[in-house]
Curated annotation (Swiss-Prot):
It comes from Geobacter sp. (strain M21). The active site is at K193 (proton acceptor). NADPH binds at S12, W13, K107, A142, R257, V281, E283. This is Glycerol-3-phosphate dehydrogenase [NAD(P)+]. One of its GO terms (molecular function) is glycerol-3-phosphate dehydrogenase [NAD(P)+] activity.
């Protein structure tokens, strides 16, 4: 079934998914905050700011008017940075069709409230509309999807009907969507992996090897799972695409913004220098702060997250943080 879809957020991932959906035959309008970006995409069929070199489907429409984006839509895909979800979706409420399925592809935890993205939606949306919420997450670099490289992700929703509808809307010959009912687990996997990816990048920047990276990924997965279980997620979710899959990709891939931030920190640059030069958002920086505070609030042990917080926000030297992780009290592996 062809959908009329509003895609909110024209970063690399939002633009890529809008293009994918348009190529599949859906009627798609991509909303961008910047009027000049809308004009460029209309004129050149390219998003040179966030997805350079990719020609966008001729059927894709562009706007910076929220009312126009939402008009008559049957599905909404929100792909704005997690710290902006509350503002953008609150502004969207007057225009949001009540029956529309809402797909969240934002990955993070709100700093001020420690709310996951679905919890933000729960606060904003009427109950009957919140039931139509799904989360889309998994190992998926935007550029690789834009180039139609085979990719698999997960769509999680509290109802089977919503999950199936999202699965059917997004699945193509190169983009395979699996269903899941664990919205909390899928969201947390997508959020926490960004913090671990910065840690893996720092390790690479310091010149440590594959052993160190493997340890960070594995113990990072344990921390992610502990936090998820404390919040009601299913442990098995973290062994899937939205957990281990996304974690491995983001900790090892050269297209990972979060890993790139970590590499530069490991090489001696300051966080403020790095962020000052970035056009796109590295979600893991803010998520480090929110995950650290959330773990403290829930009493969940997350030593990698704790050391990451001290490095990014308290100027702790990276080598000192690694030493502390390696000299903690000995324990059984477990989770």
């Amino acid at each position: 079934m062809a959908e009329k879809i509003a895609v909110i957020g024209a970063g690399s991932w939002g633009t890529t998914l809008a293009d994918l959906l348009a190529k599949k035959g859906h009627e798609v309008t991509l909303w961008a905050y910047e009027p000049e970006l809308v004009l460029e995409m209309r004129d050149t069929r390219e998003n040179s700011l966030f997805l350079p070199g990719i020609k966008l489907n001729e059927g894709l429409a562009f706007t910076n008017d929220l009312a126009q984006a939402y008009r008559g839509c049957s599905m909404v895909l929100c792909v704005v940075p997690s710290q902006l979800v509350r503002r953008v979706m609150t502004n969207s409420l007057p225009f949001l069709p009540r029956e529309a399925v809402i797909v969240s592809a934002s990955k993070g935890i709100e700093v001020d409230t420690l709310a996951t993205v679905s919890e933000i939606y729960q606060e904003i949306l009427p109950p009957e509309q919140y039931r139509n919420l799904a989360a889309l997450s998994g190992p998926s670099f935007a550029r690789e999807v834009a180039l139609e490289m085979p990719t698999a992700v997960t769509a999680a929703a509290s109802t089977e009907a919503v999950a199936r509808r999202v699965q059917e809307a997004f699945t193509t010959s190169y983009f395979r969507v699996y269903r899941n009912s664990d919205v909390v687990g899928v969201e947390l996997g997508g959020a926490i992996k960004n913090v671990i990816a910065i840690a893996a990048g720092i390790s690479d920047g310091l010149g440590f090897g594959s052993n160190t990276r493997a340890a960070l990924i594995t113990r990072g997965l344990a921390e992610m799972t502990r936090l998820g279980v404390a919040m009601g997620a299913q442990p098995s979710t973290f062994a899937g695409l939205a957990g281990m899959g996304d974690l491995v990709l983001t900790c090892t891939g050269d297209l990972s913004r979060n890993r790139s931030v970590g590499i530069q920190i490991g090489q001696g640059r300051t966080l403020s220098e790095i962020l000052g030069e970035m056009r796109m958002v590295a979600e893991g920086v803010k998520t480090t702060e929110s995950a650290y505070n959330l773990a403290k609030k829930l009493g969940v042990e997350m030593p990698i997250i704790e050391q990451m917080y001290q490095m990014l926000y308290q100027s702790k030297p990276a080598r000192e943080a690694v030493l502390e992780l390696m000299t903690r009290n000995l324990k059984a592996e477990g989770v």
